[in-house]
C-alpha cells in the first residue's frame, strides 16, 4: 500500500505514524510544511512544501492557500491513502486536494480548543470532515464535537494512540528510598498548565523534605517557568530536562513515585498512558480525556483544573500513603493499558480500515 501522510513534520506523532506503517511494509510518503531533513525520516519519502512560517501553536490559515501545491503533489505521488494528521490546518488543506481515500485524524486541540472557540474553524473543519472518507478521533469527547459539527458519524472512529510496551513497561522499575520523585512529561506550553503544578509543589515542599521533581519537555514557556521555580524557592527540588526521547521518558517514569498531568485540555493523554504503563501513581486534571483512563480514588487521583490546594493535598496524600495507593492502582492500570492502550493493537484498526477503503 502507498500511504501519504500530510502533517507537521516536527511532531512526534507524525514520525510515529510514518515509521510504524513503514515497518509493516508499506511505502510511506510525507508531505509537510515543516523543514525536516531526510535523516529525521529514514526510508520515508519526504516532500517539503515551502509555505512561510508555521506556528506550532496554531493559527496557520495561510497554509490553506497552498492547497494547489498539495493537490499537484498528491497527483504525482498517486497514494492509495491520503491521510492528514490534525483537523484544522492540514485537514482543511488536505480536503482541498480532492483525493478519494482521504482520512483525517484529529489530535486534540484542533477540535477541543480551535473548533469550540471559533465559528470560522467550525465551518472549515465541517467542510474537511464532509470531504473525508474516514475520520479518527482519540476520545469520546472529540467524537461528540464531531457530532456537533453535523458529521456523518458512520465514518468516525475512536482510536486512542496508546503506548509501545517495548519501551513503556514496569520491568525496569526502581524507586529511590531516599527521595520522593514527582514527574511531569508535558511540554512547556500554556495548555499544559505547568505553573499550576509548581504552585502546588510550593505548598507541599516543606512537608515532603525529600521531594525531587522532574519536568521533562520543551516549549516557549521554559524561561518563564524557570523564573517561577526560583520565585517559589523550588530550585533545590525541581529540574528541567528539556526535550528528551521516549527511552529517557520511560526511564524517568520508572524512577518516579508519582506522575502529574495538569493539562487544561487533551484529546487522549498519551503521557498519562505512558505513566500508567510504567506503574507510576497518576494524578491528573478532571477532564474527559483523563476520566476515560482514571477513576478518582481507584487507580489514581483526578483534581479540578484551578484547584492548587486540591492538587497539593493529593500529592501529599500520595506521599503519605504511596504503597497502599499504588498496590491498588498498579494492577488496574496495567490491565487498562493491555486492553486498550497498546499502540500496535490500535494501529491494526487503522490498517484494516485502509484496506477496506481500497476494496471500496
List each model region and its residues:
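Aromatic "clamp/platform" in nucleotide-sugar-dependent glycosyltransferases that forms part
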Residues: 264
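Short His-centered aromatic/hydrophobic patch
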Residues: 66, 84-90
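Conserved acidic donor-binding segment of nucleotide-sugar-dependent glycosyltransferases
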Residues: 296-297, 301-308, 317-323
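Carbohydrate-associated surface elements
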Residues: 141, 162
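Conserved donor-binding/catalytic core segment of Leloir-type glycosyltransferases
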Residues: 4, 174-201, 205, 214
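N-terminal subdomain of nucleotide-sugar transferases
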Residues: 1-44
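Nucleotide-activated donor-binding/catalytic signature segment of Leloir-type glycosyltransferases, i.e.
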Residues: 226-244
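Short hydrophobic beta-strand element within catalytic cores of glycosyltransferases
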Residues: 281-284
Amino acid at each position: 500500500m502507498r500511504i501519504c501522510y500530510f502533517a507537521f513534520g516536527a511532531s512526534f506523532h507524525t514520525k510515529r505514524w510514518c515509521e510504524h506503517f513503514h515497518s509493516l511494509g508499506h511505502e510511506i510518503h510525507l508531505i509537510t510544511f515543516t523543514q525536516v531533513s531526510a535523516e529525521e525520516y529514514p526510508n520515508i519519502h519526504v516532500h517539503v512544501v515551502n509555505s512561510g512560517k508555521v506556528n506550532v501553536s496554531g493559527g496557520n490559515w495561510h497554509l490553506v492557500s497552498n492547497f494547489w501545491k498539495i493537490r499537484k503533489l498528491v497527483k504525482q505521488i498517486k497514494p492509495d491513502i491520503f491521510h492528514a494528521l490534525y483537523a484544522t490546518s492540514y485537514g482543511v488543506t488536505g480536503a482541498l486536494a480532492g483525493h478519494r481515500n482521504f482520512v483525517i485524524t484529529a489530535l486534540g486541540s484542533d477540535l477541543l480548543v480551535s473548533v469550540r472557540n471559533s465559528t470560522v474553524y467550525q465551518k472549515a473543519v465541517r467542510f474537511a470532515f464532509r470531504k473525508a472518507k474516514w475520520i479518527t478521533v482519540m476520545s469520546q469527547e472529540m467524537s461528540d464535537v464531531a457530532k456537533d459539527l453535523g458529521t456523518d458519524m458512520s465514518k468516525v472512529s475512536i482510536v486512542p494512540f496508546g503506548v509501545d510496551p517495548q519501551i513503556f513497561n514496569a520491568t525496569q522499575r526502581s524507586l529511590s528510598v531516599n527521595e520522593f520523585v514527582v514527574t511531569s512529561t508535558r511540554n512547556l506550553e500554556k495548555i499544559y498548565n505547568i505553573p499550576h503544578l509548581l504552585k502546588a509543589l510550593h505548598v507541599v515542599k516543606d512537608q515532603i523534605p525529600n521531594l525531587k521533581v522532574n519536568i521533562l519537555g520543551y516549549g516557549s514557556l521554559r524561561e518563564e517557568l524557570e523564573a517561577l521555580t526560583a520565585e517559589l524557592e523550588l530550585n533545590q527540588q525541581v529540574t528541567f530536562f528539556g526535550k528528551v526521547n521516549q527511552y529517557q521518558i520511560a526511564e524517568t517514569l520508572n524512577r518516579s513515585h508519582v506522575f502529574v498531568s495538569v493539562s487544561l485540555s487533551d484529546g487522549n493523554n498519551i503521557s498519562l498512558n505512558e505513566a500508567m504503563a510504567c506503574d507510576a501513581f497518576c494524578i491528573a486534571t478532571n477532564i474527559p480525556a483523563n476520566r476515560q483512563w482514571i477513576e478518582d480514588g481507584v487507580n489514581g487521583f483526578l483534581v479540578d483544573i484551578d484547584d492548587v490546594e486540591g492538587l497539593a493535598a493529593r500529592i501529599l496524600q500520595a506521599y503519605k500513603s504511596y504503597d497502599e495507593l499504588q498496590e491498588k492502582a498498579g494492577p488496574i492500570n496495567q490491565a487498562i493499558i493491555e486492553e486498550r492502550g497498546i499502540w500496535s493493537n490500535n494501529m491494526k484498526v487503522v490498517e484494516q480500515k485502509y484496506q477496506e477503503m481500497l476494496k471500496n
